């Protein structure tokens, strides 16, 4: 795990630990560190200025708005040496060093090469830097002297103290807003803008000129064979002799405000589109920039103060996020007659399938809006990711959607307990409010819901269980690649920034670029008016307010925590269908808001079935129609006519009339429940009905256990009782654990994980770990004997089950056993120092990366499980120098740059020794959303 570790500047620690708040003005926090200089912007000239300041002995921080440095070069696809002619020679040499391994080679630098060169330049100079943070406003004292910089990220706004700010933004926006730069823009002279694209065909449009600025190389739709869905349109080429084109067009005189630039951006995208486009720049740029644009501006004093938190726009429906669910929501709301603004961080519409690199559907129902979308995209052109993004963008514009690209929402605008908009940072740093009559949170991590005060679920002091994520390569011509290599909290820009930096450092030189959307499968979720559980999914529950359908298997990408899954979990071939109720999109109390996508209200173990792209597109569309209806009728989102909405959804093909007419699922009668328990086995649907109605089922299960005569049957009932937290069968379970040797366990697996993440003995141990078993000697001894049989090479699931059982029983006498396990060779010491940047194993390969990151997560989860349990058992092992080992181990993770581990360790420590672990994240549990 230590192999290939890169040591970064210690200052990176402070940058990564920059704290922020909910996003509302007046609710911000300051960074922990002060800086001599803060460079606003991740441009190449910003990096040069930062290195120069560091060489002069100053403490420097660079704050970059995109997922990586280099928005002026990589973000605009200006990749020739002449594009960096004004840069210092030492930096030009790094940026444009020959790269014979690039595939395909266009004779220019690749965007990834630019980003990695800038990463390296700052790291070697000892400059701290953070991406995913938009510089907004320069703060000053009463005399105008600079005191720091306001930045905006996906977790709110933060303030960085500094004596000097260097404006290195694309448009010198901070210098212009504070009166430190006045551009000489003739009021009667047209401005010529440029946009670079990669295509075979020369872009052509009225008034547009296109010049080739690279060599040509063959780009092929190599992954089209994976699925007809991502194949080229009929008549579109599958092999393209592509090159970089610089496209220029003149526009009438105007300003360089963010909204003016956005209009030009969309017009340039219209003009530069070709059927065989393989990539395109995120930003336009001035072909002949006036003095002041494209260079750094040192600002120690401001001349004028910009207005504080202006209203940027007022609209009917605001959709935050233009990804898998958000883009369909925006289109649906606009089709429903609403005026729509859609705010999106990325440079393209479409989310994970266009900007995240996972283009091909896995499962899901390709019906409704998804069917329309697929049919439309199939006619567009050669390369699926580009074609899908363009179809969505154009379809939205056809109905009046105002797409705000490269803009970062930071939190909700709340008035009297109602969401009335969101705070947004525009690409030029302008920060203000977008007010709306209805808001759809399509961020995927419940940003607006969380900042509005809604309950959310993700990381906690419970067991650390997170579905795996990854950062993907962008390869010209390829629309689909999948990976699972680390854990990440999408809501935390520090965590995303660190893992993106790791991924870039790990990618091979053949890579064209890095994706800008996190390919994660589990994120912060809103706790809504209804929470969809595993039991709902497995029992096929009907809802009176069904608005979407889902279809998949339990592709868990790691371990599960639902108690039912400790008894039995469906295998890979077991596909299930589920309905999604409207209430799962509504907050418990907050009005004015719907939450869609991975942020909707559902148990983490139910999400693998609910999160398929095809289904999320349809549920997003349903949310957009609901928002439009609420605005049209002037009612709250929770008070819309659901039957009317369902009629629209049936007409669209998103749900069937039979879904609407089906009687809502009701609890089993006493007789039915007794019959179900009497014949209960490993049938998932039957188990689901029992686990969903646990309070009524438990007395029946106890009687069945007592009456059982066959040992296997008695053990089965004891197992189910234990999983439900009942100790009636504890002696039977303990005897079974004692009688069975350790079986084949499970080591952590992200990609390709289907079925159980526990062995049978593991599941018996976990069933023993309920509080009612405290003080039962047979239970304690069974756990102890199994712990004694573990060694350094034992499977992770065995360590996990022993730790969970010991922690659950709360037997302090097991502390010595846990301490011994934690002291085994190779078990401890897997936390990272704040300055470490280990390569991700397997990431340099040109493949699907099956297995990447598994071993790292395996050893960290094992160490944390043992340390957490030992700490909660009082952490007094009686082994002399091992006393306090659990706490000491947890504290090694407190400053780990992998924030998922750090947040978990801090939460456990904050709870103290006496805290009891929850199931794994504060999720809705069986029975909490029962019939």
Stretches found by the model and what they are:
Residues 27-28, 72, 131, 136, ...:
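Flavin (FAD/FMN)-binding glycine-rich loop and adjacent Rossmann-like elements that form
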Residues 32-43, 309-323:
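Beta1/beta-strand and adjacent pyrophosphate-binding region of the FAD-binding site
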Residues 59-64, 339-344:
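Short beta-strand "acidic-cap" motif of Rossmann-like dinucleotide-binding folds
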Residues 102-117, 378-391:
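Short beta-strand to alpha-helix junction loop
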Residues 125-135, 397-410:
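A conserved beta-strand/loop element that lines the FAD pocket in flavoprotein oxidoreductases
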Residues 682-695, 703-707, 712-727, 735, ...:
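Structural detector for internal amphipathic alpha-helices that build alpha-solenoid repeat scaffolds
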């Amino acid at each position: 795990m230590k192999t290939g570790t890169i040591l970064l500047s210690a200052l990176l620690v402070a940058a990564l630990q920059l704290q922020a708040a909910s996003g509302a003005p007046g609710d911000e926090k300051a960074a922990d560190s002060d800086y001599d200089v803060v460079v606003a912007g991740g441009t190449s000239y910003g990096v040069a200025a930062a290195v120069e300041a560091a060489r002069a002995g100053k403490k420097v921080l660079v704050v970059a708005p995109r997922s990586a440095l280099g928005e002026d070069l990589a973000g605009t696809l200006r990749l020739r040496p002449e594009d960096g002619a004004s840069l210092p020679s030492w930096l030009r040499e790094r940026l444009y060093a020959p790269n014979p391994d690039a595939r395909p080679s266009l004779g220019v630098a690749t965007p990834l090469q630019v980003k990695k060169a800038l990463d390296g330049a700052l790291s070697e100079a000892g400059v701290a830097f953070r991406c995913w943070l938009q510089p907004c406003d320069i703060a000053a004292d009463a005399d105008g002297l600079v005191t720091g910089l306001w930045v905006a990220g996906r977790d709110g706004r933060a303030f960085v103290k500094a004596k000097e700010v260097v404006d290195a933004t694309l448009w010198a926006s901070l210098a212009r807003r504070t009166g430190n730069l006045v551009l000489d823009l003739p009021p009667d002279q047209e401005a010529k803008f440029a946009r670079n694209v990669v295509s075979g065909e020369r872009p052509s449009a009225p008034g547009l000129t296109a010049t080739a600025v690279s060599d040509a190389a063959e780009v092929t739709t190599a992954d089209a064979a994976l699925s007809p869905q991502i194949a080229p349109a009929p008549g579109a080429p599958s092999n393209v002799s592509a090159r970089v084109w610089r496209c220029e067009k003149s526009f009438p005189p105007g300003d360089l405000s963010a909204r003016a630039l956005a209009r030009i951006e969309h017009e340039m995208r219209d003009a530069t589109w070709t059927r065989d486009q393989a990539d395109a720049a995120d930003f336009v740029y001035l072909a002949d920039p006036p003095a002041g644009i494209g260079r750094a501006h040192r600002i120690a004093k401001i001349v004028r103060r910009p207005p504080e938190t202006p209203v940027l726009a007022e609209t009917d429906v605001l959709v935050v996020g233009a990804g898998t669910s958000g883009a369909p929501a925006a289109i649906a709301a606009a089709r429903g007659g609403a005026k729509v603004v859609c705010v999106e961080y990325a440079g393209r519409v479409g989310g994970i399938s266009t900007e995240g690199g996972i283009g091909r559907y896995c499962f899901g129902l390709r019906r409704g809006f998804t069917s329309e979308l697929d049919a439309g995209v199939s006619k567009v052109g050669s390369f699926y990711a580009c074609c899908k993004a363009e179809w969505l963008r154009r379809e939205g514009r056809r109905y009046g959607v105002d797409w705000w690209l490269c803009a970062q929402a930071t939190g909700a605008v709340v008035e009297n307990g109602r969401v009335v908009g969101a705070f947004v940072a525009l690409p030029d740093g302008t920060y203000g409010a977008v007010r709306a009559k209805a808001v759809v949170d399509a961020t995927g991590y419940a940003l607006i819901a969380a900042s509005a005060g809604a309950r959310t679920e993700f990381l906690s002091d419970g067991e650390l269980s997170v579905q795996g994520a990854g950062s993907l390569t962008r390869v010209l011509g390829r629309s689909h690649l999948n990976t699972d290599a680390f854990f990440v909290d999408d809501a935390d820009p520090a965590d995303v920034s660190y893992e993106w930096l790791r991924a870039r450092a790990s990618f091979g030189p053949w890579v064209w670029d890095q994706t800008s959307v996190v390919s994660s499968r589990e994120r912060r979720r809103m706790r809504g008016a209804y929470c969809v559980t595993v039991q709902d999914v497995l029992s096929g529950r009907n809802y009176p307010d069904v608005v979407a359908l889902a279809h998949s298997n339990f592709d868990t990408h790691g371990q599960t925590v639902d108690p039912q899954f400790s008894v039995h979990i469906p295998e890979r071939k077991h596909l299930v269908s589920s309905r999604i109720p409207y209430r799962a999109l509504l907050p418990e109390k907050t009005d004015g808001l719907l939450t869609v996508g991975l942020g909707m209200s559902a148990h983490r173990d139910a999400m693998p079935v609910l999160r398929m792209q095809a289904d999320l597109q349809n549920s997003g569309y349903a949310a957009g129609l609901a928002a439009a209806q609420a605005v049209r009728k002037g009612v709250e989102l929770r008070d819309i006519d659901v039957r009317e909405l369902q009629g629209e959804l049936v007409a669209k093909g998103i749900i069937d009339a039979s879904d609407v007419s089906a009687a809502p699922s009701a609890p089993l009668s006493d007789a039915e429940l007794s019959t179900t328990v009497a014949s209960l086995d490993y049938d998932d649907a039957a188990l689901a009905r029992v686990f969903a109605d646990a309070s009524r089922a438990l007395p029946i299960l106890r009687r069945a256990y007592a009456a059982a005569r066959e040992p296997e049957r008695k053990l089965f009932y004891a197992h189910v009782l234990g999983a439900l937290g009942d100790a009636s069968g504890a002696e039977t379970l303990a005897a079974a654990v004692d009688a069975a040797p350790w079986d084949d366990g499970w080591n952590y697996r992200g990609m390709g994980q289907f079925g159980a993440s526990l062995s049978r003995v593991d599941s018996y141990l976990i069933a023993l770990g309920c509080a009612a078993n405290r003080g039962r000697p047979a239970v304690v001894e069974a756990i102890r004997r199994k712990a004694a049989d573990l060694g350094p090479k034992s499977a992770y699931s065995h360590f996990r089950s022993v730790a969970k059982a010991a922690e659950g029983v709360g037997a302090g006498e097991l502390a010595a056993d846990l301490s011994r396990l934690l002291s085994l060779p190779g078990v401890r010491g897997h936390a990272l120092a704040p300055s470490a940047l280990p390569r991700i194993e397997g990431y340099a390969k040109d493949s699907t990366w099956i297995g990447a990151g598994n071993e790292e997560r395996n050893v960290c989860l094992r160490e944390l499980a043992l340390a957490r349990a030992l700490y909660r058992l009082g952490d007094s092992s009686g082994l002399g120098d091992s006393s306090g080992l659990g706490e000491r181990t947890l504290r090694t993770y407190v400053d780990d740059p992998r924030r998922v581990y750090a947040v978990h360790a801090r939460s456990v420590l904050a709870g103290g020794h006496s805290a009891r672990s929850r199931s794994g994240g504060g999720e809705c549990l069986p029975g909490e959303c029962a019939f």
